Amino acid sequence: MAARADNVSRVDHDGVTLVEGATHDVRFAFTERTGGVSEDAYSSLNLGSHVGDDPFAVQENRRRTLEAIGAAECEHNLLVPNQVHGDHVVTVTSNGADDLENIREQIAEGCDAIVCTVREVPVMLCFADCVPVVLVAPGGFAVVHSGWKGTIARISAKACQALCEAAGCQPDDISAYIGPHILGDEYEVSQELMDRFASEFACIDAATSRMLDLSAAIREALMDAGVEASGIVDTKLSTVRQNDRFYSYRNEGGTCWRH
């Protein structure tokens, strides 16, 4: 059975504010905008290296984030994938230097979820409206980037399956955490896309609305994969309404950093 999945709180670490939790000896966090060194209107804790920010600022922001979560000594093992809005999942089962270098080559080619079953390997994915999903089980964890393409492809369920295989656990052992994202009443999409989602997910009603609730679809996919409803926590934090705390690609006109 999954551990209680409601242990998430907002904590300030010398200016770096995290929405964080810990389950099965895995510590995880969703970052906010504050506490970094990036400059301009989108300051300051930008973690994305692909948005035109100073690379040294990004490196320092990532270092501060790891320090805040208690993983500063593991910075040399940090994994940050090239996110491509797909459904490819990469699994990490060794923290050896050569093995991690091989993983870095794989994730540089593109992946949107990383499963990890070894200690001292921090995993960092970047977001600005898309849905962050953290899966935690005895013996491992997964971090998932789920935009609409990944959501309709059920990437969270695929990461769940990969985590179960790698950690030797069952889906009902998993606790799932859905982080800050663009909420269903903020995300208007085309009728064609609504119809596609409605054909895939029972929770999506394309007949009455064009507002797409990605987190509801993710929850359905996880439950279909065997994760218990009681083991799924949605922080219900909005990147749009709470744009002062989180980056929002849509709310900021397509120009923003990444948390």
Q: What is each residue range found by the language model?
A:
Residues M1-H259:
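Active-site microenvironment for binding and transforming phosphate-containing groups
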